[in-house]
Amino acid sequence: MNVLFLTMSSGLKNIETSGIYTDLIRKFRDEGHEVYVVYPRERRLRLPTEVKHEDRVHLLGVKTLNVTKTNLIEKGLGQVTLERQFKLGLEKYFGKVKFDIILYSTPPITFTKVIRYAKKRNPKAVSYLLLKDIFPQNAVDLGILTKDGLKGVLYRLFRKKEKDLYRISDYIGCMSPANVKYVIEHNPEIDPAVVEIAPNSYDIPSEISVEYGVTDHIRQKYGLPINKPIFIYGGN
């Protein structure tokens, strides 16, 4: 099976490192599938568009503008041009590959044209959205956008793109039951049967070796009790 994965994550230089996307890529690879990844190579890296092949994993780094950690103007232009750059890279380097699954995650919500292009070339492929963030609603919750006024124009624009992304997706994987419920309730045009739970992918090691005394040192450094369990909330 050939899997196409579109992502904004630039941390894919070494797929053997632990991460929600690298772990997922390795799982597909280890099950005997070919994985084709398209990700941005931001301008600050000064690297060209390039494809690397590593044991059934094909990494296409597409040269883009800076889309993270930059000013709003470049970030906006970067997002606008990203679809075209990804589409051109996909056509040039993976144009002859027949994909069975088209996988992509949010953010961003601006991959619709790339996905539509990939589905047109691969009409039998299944498109699957990994819905990590519900945007633009999360921007409203954070006070970045509003539903009225000038910012409301941006909200409605992004809301339309969000709905377009849902519409083109054969399946939508959400982080939690509450997210599933939210997506269905606020997008009644979506068939509830295609919305399901798909939490972060993580390859849990069978054992973790920790040098003696290291944990006590870390607890002391941050003023945490030595003899009590510590729970860390990761945000999802």
Where are these regions (language model features)?
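Carbohydrate-associated surface elements
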Residues: M175-A178, A198-S201
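Acceptor-binding helix/loop patch of EC 2.4 sugar-transfer enzymes
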Residues: M8, V67-E74, V97, A125-K160, ...
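Conserved donor-binding/catalytic core segment of Leloir-type glycosyltransferases
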Residues: H217, P225-N236
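Membrane-proximal helix-turn-helix segments that form the acceptor-binding/catalytic region
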Residues: Y117-R121, G152-C174
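A short helix/loop element that forms part of the nucleotide-sugar donor recognition site in Leloir-type
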Residues: T49-V51, I208-L224
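Short N-terminal targeting/anchoring amphipathic segment
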Residues: H58-L60, L90-F111, K120-L130, Y171
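A conserved catalytic-core segment of Leloir-type glycosyltransferases
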Residues: V37-F94
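N-terminal subdomain of nucleotide-sugar transferases
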Residues: M1-V51, D55-H58
